[in-house]
Amino acid sequence: MAQRYDEMVHYPGLDGMPLAGFGDAHTGRALQHHSLSQSAPYGSTGAAHRVPMPPGMGSNDGLKREKDEIYGHPLFPLLALVFEKCELATCSPRDNSGSFPGGDVCSSDSFNEDIAVFAKQVRTEKPLFSSNPELDSLMIQAIQVLRFHLLELEKVHDLCDNFCHRYITCLKGKMPIDLVIDDRDGSSKSDLEDFTGSCTSLSDQNNSWIRDHDETGSTHSGTPGPSSGGLASQSGDNSSEQGDCMDNSVASPSTGDDDDLDRDKKRNKKRGIFPKVATNIMRAWLFQHLSHPYPSEEQKKQLAQDTGLTILQVNNWFINARRRIVQPMIDQSNRTGQGGAPYSPDGQNMGGYVMDGQQHMGIRPPGFQGIPGDYTAAPSTMPMGFPPAGYTPAIPPHSAGLRHGPSLHSYLPGHPHHASMILPAGASPHHLVSAQSPADALLNGQNIDIHAH
């Protein structure tokens, strides 16, 4: 119909009419009442404005005559004007700073002015209605429907503007905090998914390493107790070696094929998960430093440079890793420990996984770490600790004795077997220094080989 509007002749009164807005809903009724009160005869003035139909369109004379009557109706220019306003309001950007007196050309605020100007110009030249009352009613209803449509479009625009304003305000107030929280949640979920498959295999390797140490007569004692500097250094060496082994095992995924890995990578990219290379670097560092999985500030900076992440992301990753990698390994080893003895980082040998001196990992500080109960050592001027490096524990040759060893209560003062536990091999009780109590002999007698074969 827009093409037909362009092909039509210019209607008198439509040229030069300001395209303002629209007014209230009662204007149409007022216009109709005003027009009915006119005494001017209904004539055929509208026939002068009829547009000739293109050839081939009106084979039926009746249809052609009806179209000509609609196009030549005095209210048809107003109908075309309202229709154009609806099109502009639908597909054109709104401009509140328009040059028209009533504001935006697509607005409904100046509808009264539009109607008044049109009625004034038309009344001076011809009547507002034709000789066909049915056609007059059709034109008025069509104008009202388009005007209601224009009002609804304006409501939609107002709702859109209100929603956009509130949405932008909400984003400005919450976006910084929400981004940090979402980043942490995403990294936590990614760490959990990445490490679920590796925890079980690492725990199995840990158990096999424990059995290997038991069979080969490792220098690590299965008896819970304090550790010396020499044993701590050996434990650190074993930790690094086993960490390398674990790093190699983690570097080669054991489950899934290449297609699954590609799909996982695509899914991780969509979720904003850390790159696989970055997680592998941090995992390798974690497994190589299981005895103390707490990187220093310099190490965090270096890891951040190596992985391309921020220091905060590296720090959060290690917090999650200590909770979701190290602790499940300890729990899994407790459930699958050999000989029915519960696995504990306080006493049982875990092949380099002991977190030395870490209070928040549930491990007691150096001293009598493996002593159960509420035993409190007697005051002494010398620090408590393991025997010096170089001593070999007196452990039964049987593998069960290697794992469990004698009860630590035997080393406590007052126990029936206390004297025999602190004597050297082949020595009798009278060889002890009489000036020292059994507790002093245990704590201060460093020159007594209590583990001699």
UniProtKB/Swiss-Prot annotation:
Coiled-coil region(s): none
Compositionally biased intervals (Polar residues): 197-209, 231-242
SMART domains for this protein: HOX
SUPFAM superfamilies attached to this UniProt entry: Homeodomain-like
PROSITE patterns: HOMEOBOX_2
Annotated spans, Disordered: 33-64, 192-272
GO-annotated molecular function: DNA binding
DNA-binding region(s) from the entry: 267-329
CDD domains, per database record: homeodomain (cd00086)
Keywords: Activator, Developmental protein, Differentiation, DNA-binding, Homeobox, Neurogenesis, Nucleus, Transcription, Transcription regulation
Subcellular location: Nucleus
Extent of the signal sequence: none
GO CC terms of this entry: cytoplasm; nucleus
Residue ranges with Low complexity bias: 218-230
Domain MEIS N-terminal: residue ranges: 102-185
BP GO terms, sorted: anterior/posterior pattern specification; cell differentiation; central nervous system development; hindbrain development; positive regulation of DNA-templated transcription; positive regulation of MAPK cascade; positive regulation of transcription by RNA polymerase II
A Pfam family of this chain: Meis_PKNOX_N
Family statement drawn from the similarity comment of this UniProt entry: Belongs to the TALE/MEIS homeobox family.
PANTHER family (alphabetical): HOMEOBOX PROTEIN TRANSCRIPTION FACTORS (PTHR11850)
The protein's role, per its UniProt record: A caudalizing protein which is required to pattern the anterior/posterior (A/P) axis during central nervous system (CNS) formation. Inhibits anterior neural expression and acts as a transcriptional activator to induce posterior neural gene expression. Maintains a proper A/P balance required for hindbrain formation by activating the FGF/MAPK pathway, which modulates the planar cell polarity (PCP) pathway. Interacts with retinoid signaling during hindbrain patterning.
Protein's UniProt name: Homeobox protein meis3
The organism of origin for this protein: Xenopus tropicalis
Originating gene: meis3
